[in-house]
Structures are given as C-alpha cells and as structure tokens.
C-alpha cells in the first residue's frame, strides 16, 4: 500500500484543482470522488443526475484503495469507512471564505452547462438546487470530520495560487 492523500474542503474550495495539481507534482493518480459518486453513463449532458448509493461508493473506493499504489483523492470529507481512513497518509484541508466558494460554484456551473444553467434553461432547477445545497452546508463540516481522524493534516488557504499551495504541500509530504 502506498500513499493515499485526501484533499478535502467544502464545495468551491478548489479540491479537484488542487488534488489534480498535487497528483501531477508527486507523480501519482488523481481521483475525483464525483467520478465515483456519479454514473456519467445515465445522462452524459448532466452527469450529476443520478448518484450511486453510499454503500456502492464505499465499495468502489475500497477496491481502489486496495489496488492502487499511490493516489490523491478530492472529496468534501473522507467519510468512507474505517478501512479507507486507515489508509490515509495525509489529509490536505482547503479553507476558503464562503462567499468566494459560492461564487466559484456558480461560475463552474455556468462554465459546464452554459445557458442551460440559467433561469429557463434545461438544468436550471438542478443547478439552483445544488447552489442552495452548497449555501446551506454546515461551515464546520470538514473541521468536524478532521477532528475524528488520526493522520497528518495540512491546512492551506485556498485563495492563494494553486502552485504556491502545491509547492508548500510537496515540501511537507
């Protein structure tokens, strides 16, 4: 078993971007939990339409953990069972003010779905529902979860340039 690094933070913190850059820097696989949670086959135009059951996600992730040497996972938290947590080498927690995170979520929705995400668009209701969910999320969700694990935790400021944070993290690993 190699290194399993989790990059976590609330929606819009920059988890996927940071995790992908870190994985490239340390030369290992990048995995985004969204690719495990959501089956992109059902509706490729709106891949977030149908999520897998939590138990299936845990099973898929456990198979990955048991089969991979090194990888960096992007996820809000690492609540995927004790086996997953036992494999964590390090957790990177990205902290970003709520207003910035929500703007990033909104901007990302528009980049991905364009006018379909706007009022009257095909995905407006789904996108609005997701935005409302992000806005209502408990700001302590990640830190509360972090307090339950026993592995090195590196906290970074997600408003800083990705390259600066990746350099800092790489030095600390």
Residue ranges and their predicted role:
Residues 20, 24-62:
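Conserved substrate/cofactor phosphate-moiety recognition/catalytic segment
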Residues 7:
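Hydrophobic anchor at the beta1->P-loop junction of P-loop NTPases
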Residues 1-4, 69:
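Pre-Walker A (Motif I) flank of P-loop NTPase domains
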Residues 16:
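Walker A/P-loop
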Residues 87-108:
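Conserved phosphate-donor/acceptor-positioning beta-strand/loop module used by diverse small-molecule
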Residues 114-165:
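Small-molecule kinase domains that catalyze NTP-dependent phosphoryl transfer to phosphate-bearing small molecules
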Residues 10:
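P-loop (Walker A) phosphate-binding loop of NTP-binding proteins
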Residues 13:
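ATP-binding Walker
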């Amino acid at each position: 078993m190699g290194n399993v690094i989790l990059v976590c933070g609330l929606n819009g913190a920059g988890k996927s971007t940071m995790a992908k850059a870190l994985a490239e820097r340390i030369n290992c696989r990048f995995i985004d939990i969204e690719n495990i949670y959501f089956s992109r086959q059902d509706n490729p135009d709106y891949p977030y339409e149908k999520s897998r059951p939590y138990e299936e996600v845990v099973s898929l992730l456990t198979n990955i953990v048991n089969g991979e040497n090194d990888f960096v996972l992007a996820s809000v938290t690492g609540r995927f069972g004790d086996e997953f947590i036992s494999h964590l080498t390090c957790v990177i927690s990205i902290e970003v003010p709520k207003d910035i995170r929500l703007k990033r979520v909104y901007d990302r929705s528009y980049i991905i779905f364009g006018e379909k995400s706007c009022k009257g668009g095909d995905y407006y209701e789904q996108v609005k529902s997701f935005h409302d969910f992000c806005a209502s999320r408990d700001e302590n969700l990640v830190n509360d979860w972090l307090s339950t694990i026993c592995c090195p935790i590196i906290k970074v400021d997600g408003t800083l340039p990705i390259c600066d944070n990746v350099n800092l993290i790489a030095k600390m690993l």
